[in-house]
Amino acid sequence: MFLKLLDKLGRKKTVLDRGPSHPKYNEAKPWMNRYYLLLRHRPKWFPFNILIHEMLADDHGDGVHNHTFPYITIILRGGYWETLKSGKFWRSPGYMGFRSANNLHRVDLKKGTKPLTIFISGPFGLRKGPRSEYGIDFKTKK
């Protein structure tokens, strides 16, 4: 009910699994519903934001990604598999993760679930380090 209220207030954004510059943009599918609890359009100078993420699909492609800011994530519902350099871990409801901007990771969902998280993004910064696959075969998720 709370998410429906945020939607009615214009605080929801559906993020697709690829952007308009992608050659197969016409095949884009919803990847995540993002609900803005604090700022819908956060200025870069503002130090943080608070959102709710409703994940609809696995992370794009076969590799890992990082963020342009440090962040905290708190799982409210569902859970997901997170792949880090140190291995693949199940993150269940109640899990709280603290990540730096140069942390590389990948999120994969359990089939038929839509995990819900509180996502607190920190101050913007530049990405550090290369995106790599850590030697993990992401196609087989091993």
What are these regions (language model features)?
Residues 1-49:
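A short, N-terminal "cap"/entry segment at the start of jelly-roll beta-barrel domains
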Residues 18-25, 123-125, 135-142:
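A glycine-rich, hydrophobic/aromatic-adjacent loop/helix-cap motif
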Residues 49-67, 101:
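Conserved short histidine dyad/triad with adjacent acidic residue
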Residues 57-58, 80-81, 103-105, 122-126:
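Short, solvent-exposed loop/turn segments at secondary-structure junctions
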Residues 66-81:
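Short, conserved beta-strand element in jelly-roll/cupin
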Residues 83-106:
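Short acidic-glycine-tyrosine-enriched beta hairpin
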Residues 98, 112-129:
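A short hydrophobic beta-strand segment most commonly corresponding to one strand
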Residues 102-104, 109-111, 127-142:
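Acidic/His-leaning functional-site neighborhoods
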